[in-house]
């Protein structure tokens, strides 16, 4: 058994504000939301990140993210412009709970949350070619 807060929620050892559950996936409201309606979607089987999650969960987790997104848009007409869906993979990317999870974050006008793009890297064409080849060869 993992000493994992999300596993404890799955096993009903800790409470949650559940919005969806099926045999593979659980979705519940984030108790430290970035915006109103911020929801977490998790596989019921423990894995530390998307990179080592069993493939049988991939399709289901994304389908549930879509269901939650559509539900949020139906119940809140003030959602402005869209919804962010993301997963941080590793501490360097901001992952704090090491159980695979996706954030479904409704966006509101002037909500103060967002991904800010920094300076452009200004890579040369050859560097783009080299990088695309390296990635392709490692898939």
Swiss-Prot record:
Short motif (Histidine triad motif): ranges: 99-103
Native source species: Borreliella burgdorferi (strain ATCC 35210 / DSM 4680 / CIP 102532 / B31) (Borrelia burgdorferi)
GO BP, sorted A to Z: nucleotide metabolic process
Listed name of the protein: Uncharacterized HIT-like protein BB_0379
Annotated ranges, domain HIT: 5-114
Highest taxon of source: Bacteria
One Gene Ontology term of the molecular function aspect: catalytic activity
């Amino acid at each position: 058994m993992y000493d994992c807060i999300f596993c404890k929620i799955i096993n009903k050892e800790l409470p949650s504000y559940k919005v969806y559950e099926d045999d593979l996936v659980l979705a519940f409201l984030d108790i430290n939301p970035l915006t109103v309606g911020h929801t977490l979607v998790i596989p019921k089987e423990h894995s530390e990140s998307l990179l080592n999650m069993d493939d049988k969960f991939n399709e289901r987790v994304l389908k549930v993210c879509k269901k939650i997104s559509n539900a949020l848009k139906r119940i809140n007409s003030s959602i402005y412009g869209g919804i962010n869906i993301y997963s941080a993979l590793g501490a360097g990317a901001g992952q704090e709970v090491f159980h695979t999870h996706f954030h479904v974050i409704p966006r509101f006008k002037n909500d103060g949350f967002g991904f800010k793009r920094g300076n452009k890297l200004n890579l040369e064409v050859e560097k783009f070619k080299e990088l695309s080849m390296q990635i392709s060869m490692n898939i």
